[in-house]
Amino acid sequence: MKLNNLPSEFQEALPILEKIKAAGFEAYFVGGSVRDAILGRPIHDVDIATSSYPQETKQIFSRTIDVGIEHGTVLVLEGKKEYEITTFRTEEEYVDFRRPSQVSFVRSLEEDLKRRDFTVNAFALDEEAQIVDLFDGMTDLENRTLRAVGIPAERFNEDALRIMRGFRFAATLDFEIEPTTFEAMVQTAPLLEKISVERSFIEFDKLLMADFWRKGLRAMIDSKAYNFLPDLAGKSDELEAMLTSLTEEFRFSTSEQAWALLFVCLGIDNIKSFLKKWKTSNDFQRSVVKLVEIYQLRQAGPVTKQICFKYGKEFLYLVEELHQAQGFVTDFAAIDKIDQALTIHDKHEIVVNGGHLMKAFDLKPGPVLGELLKEVEFQIVEGQLENEEQAIMTFVKGILENE
């Protein structure tokens, strides 16, 4: 079969394939980019596989970088573009369910494609736009089916992260997982405990951000694979609640929004501790905590000036989107109105700081100074005090005189 419309990303990379072929070797576009081209989806990374060994690849191109040469990968710099070119390879036993004990370079495309995870990721595309499909992936694409290459249990034993990738592909492609493949996922799910948490987080996060995230999460719940992810063991009811609490068409705007809803459904108090186990960044943790706090505040009452000032309009909007999808009363207009009425949006905009107050009133650092600054901030946000030096000094003087 021939791909009728070769995407521009492939067209730009054709000279790479042609140079390798001119040197006497085979070269193909491979992997998910070929699948996406067939489906008419946007292409992200263009991966190239070749029969040339790494040292041979380096002789073909003048500008190369060894980015993973022990695994057969050479980065080729061509013009302003960079391309990862990987030698056809086979992989020996996976000793830790993540990495092969040994990689062997081969000249056979078929041997290379055999080690791929799913049939829809095992395509190759040559310079004439001919699709190489050795595992009937085209039929699976047409049937919107996710099927492991070869014996499913072997694929997941080789790299247990493929289980999470399977859920993610179901969510991004809107595919059904083929029954034998799904059963192998169920049986090998305990191996997820062997996978680095960071890698599992990336796949789970991509799942939640996908258009068909419900399908991926449904598969994860049905497989009980969540039992082998950090702090999710026994949480099937809570994960079900995440599925049922939102309108069918809802899509998450940000990762932080998705994880915030997860925590709302899980009912977890120590969110930072949970996210630390998932090895997330401090910024991510802080953002998710803020969203959960806002969610709880909105459950208790309307948005106030203090809430808007503390968290900012963008965060309030994200929570309001969740509320809207859950059928609660929302008021985006009120958030806009309050935000526009604020005379400051950050405490650093206040014209008087602690140093000014210490000098003017002979104060020392401590609780008294802290409370004064908080009260000044509160009154400015409420619109009861002008953000002007003389007005603030008079206000503080009045407080101190009345103590």
UniProtKB/Swiss-Prot annotation:
<feature type="binding site">
    <location>
        <position position="168"/>
    </location>
    <ligand>
        <name>ATP</name>
    </ligand>
</feature>
<keyword id="KW-0692">RNA repair</keyword>
<dbReference type="GO" id="GO:0042245">
    <property type="term" value="P:RNA repair"/>
</dbReference>
<keyword id="KW-0460">Magnesium</keyword>
<feature type="binding site">
    <location>
        <position position="32"/>
    </location>
    <ligand>
        <name>ATP</name>
    </ligand>
</feature>
<feature type="binding site">
    <location>
        <position position="162"/>
    </location>
    <ligand>
        <name>ATP</name>
    </ligand>
</feature>
<feature type="binding site">
    <location>
        <position position="35"/>
    </location>
    <ligand>
        <name>ATP</name>
    </ligand>
</feature>
<feature type="binding site">
    <location>
        <position position="35"/>
    </location>
    <ligand>
        <name>CTP</name>
    </ligand>
</feature>
<dbReference type="Pfam" id="PF01743">
    <property type="entry name" value="PolyA_pol"/>
</dbReference>
<comment type="subunit">
    <text>Homodimer.</text>
</comment>
<dbReference type="GO" id="GO:0000287">
    <property type="term" value="F:magnesium ion binding"/>
</dbReference>
<keyword id="KW-0694">RNA-binding</keyword>
<keyword id="KW-0548">Nucleotidyltransferase</keyword>
<dbReference type="InterPro" id="IPR043519">
    <property type="entry name" value="NT_sf"/>
</dbReference>
<feature type="binding site">
    <location>
        <position position="162"/>
    </location>
    <ligand>
        <name>CTP</name>
    </ligand>
</feature>
<keyword id="KW-0819">tRNA processing</keyword>
<comment type="similarity">
    <text>Belongs to the tRNA nucleotidyltransferase/poly(A) polymerase family. Bacterial CCA-adding enzyme type 3 subfamily.</text>
</comment>
<dbReference type="InterPro" id="IPR023068">
    <property type="entry name" value="CCA-adding_enz_firmicutes"/>
</dbReference>
<dbReference type="GO" id="GO:0000049">
    <property type="term" value="F:tRNA binding"/>
</dbReference>
<feature type="binding site">
    <location>
        <position position="168"/>
    </location>
    <ligand>
        <name>CTP</name>
    </ligand>
</feature>
<keyword id="KW-0547">Nucleotide-binding</keyword>
<feature type="binding site">
    <location>
        <position position="165"/>
    </location>
    <ligand>
        <name>CTP</name>
    </ligand>
</feature>
<feature type="binding site">
    <location>
        <position position="159"/>
    </location>
    <ligand>
        <name>ATP</name>
    </ligand>
</feature>
<keyword id="KW-0479">Metal-binding</keyword>
<dbReference type="GO" id="GO:0004810">
    <property type="term" value="F:CCA tRNA nucleotidyltransferase activity"/>
</dbReference>
<dbReference type="InterPro" id="IPR032828">
    <property type="entry name" value="PolyA_RNA-bd"/>
</dbReference>
<dbReference type="GO" id="GO:0005524">
    <property type="term" value="F:ATP binding"/>
</dbReference>
<dbReference type="InterPro" id="IPR050264">
    <property type="entry name" value="Bact_CCA-adding_enz_type3_sf"/>
</dbReference>
<keyword id="KW-0067">ATP-binding</keyword>
<keyword id="KW-0808">Transferase</keyword>
<feature type="binding site">
    <location>
        <position position="32"/>
    </location>
    <ligand>
        <name>CTP</name>
    </ligand>
</feature>
<feature type="binding site">
    <location>
        <position position="165"/>
    </location>
    <ligand>
        <name>ATP</name>
    </ligand>
</feature>
<feature type="binding site">
    <location>
        <position position="116"/>
    </location>
    <ligand>
        <name>CTP</name>
    </ligand>
</feature>
<feature type="binding site">
    <location>
        <position position="47"/>
    </location>
    <ligand>
        <name>Mg(2+)</name>
    </ligand>
</feature>
<protein>
    <recommendedName>
        <fullName>CCA-adding enzyme</fullName>
        <ecNumber>2.7.7.72</ecNumber>
    </recommendedName>
</protein>
<dbReference type="InterPro" id="IPR032810">
    <property type="entry name" value="CCA-adding_enz_C"/>
</dbReference>
<feature type="binding site">
    <location>
        <position position="45"/>
    </location>
    <ligand>
        <name>Mg(2+)</name>
    </ligand>
</feature>
<feature type="binding site">
    <location>
        <position position="116"/>
    </location>
    <ligand>
        <name>ATP</name>
    </ligand>
</feature>
<dbReference type="Pfam" id="PF12627">
    <property type="entry name" value="PolyA_pol_RNAbd"/>
</dbReference>
<dbReference type="GO" id="GO:0001680">
    <property type="term" value="P:tRNA 3'-terminal CCA addition"/>
</dbReference>
<comment type="function">
    <text>Catalyzes the addition and repair of the essential 3'-terminal CCA sequence in tRNAs without using a nucleic acid template. Adds these three nucleotides in the order of C, C, and A to the tRNA nucleotide-73, using CTP and ATP as substrates and producing inorganic pyrophosphate. tRNA 3'-terminal CCA addition is required both for tRNA processing and repair. Also involved in tRNA surveillance by mediating tandem CCA addition to generate a CCACCA at the 3' terminus of unstable tRNAs. While stable tRNAs receive only 3'-terminal CCA, unstable tRNAs are marked with CCACCA and rapidly degraded.</text>
</comment>
<dbReference type="Pfam" id="PF13735">
    <property type="entry name" value="tRNA_NucTran2_2"/>
</dbReference>
